[in-house]
Design a protein with these regions (language model features):
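Enriched for short, Lys/Arg-rich terminal
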Residues: 69-107
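Basic, Lys/Arg-enriched alpha-helical interface segments
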Residues: 1-68, 101-107
Length: 107
């Protein structure tokens, strides 16, 4: 899919993180897990993708040299992504309640 002249790419680490969030949120009710994944994907495609540079640059302690940006959904979940000239790569998604020092971004 192309939005704003950039191809949207879901990195394998992003997909894996979504699966982990779905499992965590759906522990007692699978619908809640699926609904969370849908909200994050909709947020990425409908809010981030059209205006990727409107969210702040973000330095993750475990990846200080990568040109990342982070967008936060409802103060609980964050989407980490990289903006390139022809691509918008969604790298990772996580709960903001996690210890950031423990986050390991996929390459």
């Amino acid at each position: 899919m192309i939005v704003g002249g950039r191809e949207l790419v879901l990195h394998q680490g992003f997909v894996q993180a979504l699966l982990e969030l779905e499992k965590w949120a759906g522990q007692h009710d699978a619908r809640k897990g699926r609904a969370l994944v849908k909200r994050i994907i909709d947020f990425a495609y409908d809010v981030i993708a059209p205006f990727p540079l409107s969210f702040p640059a973000y330095t993750l302690p475990t990846a200080p040299t990568r040109p990342l940006r982070r967008a936060v959904l409802n103060r609980q979940y964050a989407v980490v992504y990289e903006v390139f000239e022809t691509e918008l790569v969604f790298v990772y998604a996580y709960s903001t309640h996690r210890n950031l020092g423990l986050l390991e971004l996929p390459e």
